[in-house]
Amino acid sequence: IFCFVDQMPPGMRQTLYFKDDDARLSFLQGNYITLTNLTEREAQRIIDLRISPINVSVHTTDPQLHCTMLGNKNALRSLDYIRAFCKAGIVMNGQIVVCPGWNDGDQLRRTLRDLTEMQFSSCSLVPVGITKYRQGLAKLRPVDAATAAEIIDIADEYGRENLRRFGTRRFFCADELYLRAGRPLPQAEYYEGYRQLENGVGLMRSLEDDFLAGLATVDVPAHFSPFTIATGTAAAPFLRGLVQRAMGDYPGLRGQVIAVENDFFGHTIDVAGLLTGQDISAQLKKRPLGDRVLIPLHMLRHGETVFLDDYTVERLSQELGRPVQVVGLDGFDLADALFAPAESRQDNGRS
């Protein structure tokens, strides 16, 4: 009912419509899979070879609801595989995409209770992403502030129980839930080594801590180069706070953060990683931007300089009339980028 691939507009490159549910790539590349395509022979092979970790999209442990949400008659089998893997000691990282009215509230409590008893390794809770392209799909509503707060409270309730009984919280909420609920981010210790970082869990806490550490050791140039950071509406206030901190520590530094609305997928999509080059260009080209524009690495296709809409960084730079610098994913990269000269281009992260 919520698969992002099913909510894509027509006419995009074919690779974006590919639904990858291969257990081998879950192990090798960290893909989250539903296990619905897994055969009994393949499942036994995972157990025999002790292949770990496996990243699994859980969503719910209610059998009927599980089938409904995944739209697959084999979904019941995937729950059996999860139980078998847990019993065999296979490390599994899970995700629950919380859809209000479907798998939140009491259903979420049931899922967390079941995963606790299975000794599931770790599980992230993330809000459903809803684009404007949902023709023919089930009705969904976005996670609002009250729902986000309830999700956090439920996760914390079971997290405290797990911490007391087993020494791990097991359940972790994505940063986006704290932003929507208007609640402060947990401290670094909460995230237990950031096991769910790629799922947006603890990314902002890690970024802030590394950024503040980087500010203390950054190479300060003789002349500062004014900048603009382009990001999604969700992270913009957080990044503004970091930039203001940097400008307070270094009075000559000048920069701004611009929140880019997602006109391409719809304004309910507020994360930077789903912004397109055309939206950034349209919303920035008539504004004062300083000497350069900074964008986060996760806006781009892995290993390339291409946005979701096939815009290139070079094209965006030409349309904005200034260098577009790609900033790596940690806070040290961000601190370095604020002080970089206009003519340099950030690479894909620190070497």
Where do the protein language model's features map onto the residues?
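Auxiliary Fe-S-binding modules of radical SAM enzymes
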Residues: 12, 116-119, 124, 129-351
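Conserved Radical SAM active-site core
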Residues: 1-119, 129-158
